[in-house]
Every structure is written in structure tokens, then in C-alpha cells.
């Protein structure tokens, strides 16, 4: 599906429709490939990936807002700032939000695939990103998000992905402007993939 089709009239919240659609696992993600980190000529290719000039880690404290239900999310949630932060990567359950769960046999939600309950918890993560045009593409890489997420760059929808324990990559170059940019990620606790990923989590 093209991004232009998703950018039709309606609030960002009203467009959050992919997490209950088994035919829409990914939107605007790059094709799957072997994982690698580019190293410049002269760099030690066996060094830690953090030493690559082509890698910029966005780990650290992100602005964070939590909602017990997706229904509680404001229509204009992209415009609402938060004074609270949370470390990334982490589990929000370890920071006073929601509650941990271990599922071994029973589903954590009422069995009604591909639908999930209305009280689907949502976490809104946001941070600034400084960009200088240098002719290089900017590929935003998520190394695992449970259970799905919607990505926004400068309040514009940039993509969607699920499959909790897999890498999702987005070419966000075309969404960036010179200077400061805002990255926002809306993470949902449950999606249609929960019916496949529920056990031993």
C-alpha cells in the first residue's frame, strides 16, 4: 500500500487500522535481507557496530505517554507533548505502566481473531532527531517491538510493522527536513499477531 493512500482525510488515530488486518503486516518497510552494518574504508569490520560511522544509535530516554486503551488516545495525539520519559529499549511494564504477564497455555485476550480488545494498551514514544543533508539515506531500524507499531516522522505517517521479534526497517530520508525532526512511535500491546505470538511470552 502506498503512503499516499494512507494520507487521506482523517485523524492519525482513525488511521490506526492495520493491527487487526492479517493482510497488512507491514507498510512502507524495506524488503527483508541479511542483517549488516556498513563500515567505511579503513574501518575495522570486526569492531563493535557502535564504532561504524554509518550507525547512529537512538537508544536512550524518549518522551513517553501511556494509555490503558487505544480508545483513550486523543485524535490529535501527535500534537500532545509529554514531560515523562522512558528508556529505550525497555519494557514499559518495568516502569510502572500496565502489568507484566506470562502466557503459557491460555490466550491473554478473548479469542476473536483477528480482532483484539478495545482496551488494548498503547505507548506513545517520541524524540527529536537532528538531520543534515549529506547525500546519504537514513534507514530507521527497529530490532523488535511488541506487538506492533505505527511510525510517524514530523507528525506524518511513515509506516507500520508487526512481528515482535523481527527487525523492521524504514527509509525515512524523504520524510526528513534539514535541522530538527520529530520521530514518534505508537506501540500497541496486542494485534492480530498476538494470536500467533502468545505462547511463552
Give residue spans per PLM region.
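Accessory beta-strand-rich segments of carbohydrate-active enzymes
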Residues: 2-33, 44-49, 63-67, 97-99, ...
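Carboxylate-rich, polar loop motifs that coordinate divalent cations or form catalytic acidic clusters
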Residues: 40-42
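Short secondary-structure boundary/capping segments within folded domains
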Residues: 54-55, 77
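Mature N-terminal segment immediately following signal peptide/propeptide cleavage
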Residues: 55-65
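Predominantly extracellular/luminal regions of secreted and cell-surface proteins
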Residues: 63-100
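Helix N-cap / beta->alpha transition motif
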Residues: 87-89, 105, 171-172
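Surface-exposed, low-complexity/disordered Ser/Thr/Gly/Pro/Asn-rich loops and linkers
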Residues: 95-100, 104-115
Amino acid at each position: 500500500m502506498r503512503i499516499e493512500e494512507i494520507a487521506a482525510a482523517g485523524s492519525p488515530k482513525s488511521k490506526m487500522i492495520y493491527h487487526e488486518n492479517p493482510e497488512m503486516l507491514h507498510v512502507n518497510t524495506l524488503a527483508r535481507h541479511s542483517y549488516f552494518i556498513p563500515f567505511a574504508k579503513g574501518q575495522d569490520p570486526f569492531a563493535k557496530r557502535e564504532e561504524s560511522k554509518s550507525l547512529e544509535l537512538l537508544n536512550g530516554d524518549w518522551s513517553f505517554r501511556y494509555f490503558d486503551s487505544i480508545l483513550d488516545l486523543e485524535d490529535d495525539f501527535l500534537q500532545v507533548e509529554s514531560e515523562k520519559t522512558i528508556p529505550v529499549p525497555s519494557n514499559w511494564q518495568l516502569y510502572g505502566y500496565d502489568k507484566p504477564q506470562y502466557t503459557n497455555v491460555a490466550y491473554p485476550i478473548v479469542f476473536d481473531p483477528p480482532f483484539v480488545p478495545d482496551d488494548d494498551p498503547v505507548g506513545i514514544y517520541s524524540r527529536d532527531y537532528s538531520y543534515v543533508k549529506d547525500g546519504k539515506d537514513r534507514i530507521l531500524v527497529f530490532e523488535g517491538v511488541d506487538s506492533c507499531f505505527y511510525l510517524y516522522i514530523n507528525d506524518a505517517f511513515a509506516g507500520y510493522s508487526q512481528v515482535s521479534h523481527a527487525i523492521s526497517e524504514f527509509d525515512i530520508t524523504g520524510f526528513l527536513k534539514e535541522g530538527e525532526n520529530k520521530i514518534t512511535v505508537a506501540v500497541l500491546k496486542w494485534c492480530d499477531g498476538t494470536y500467533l505470538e502468545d505462547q511463552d511470552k
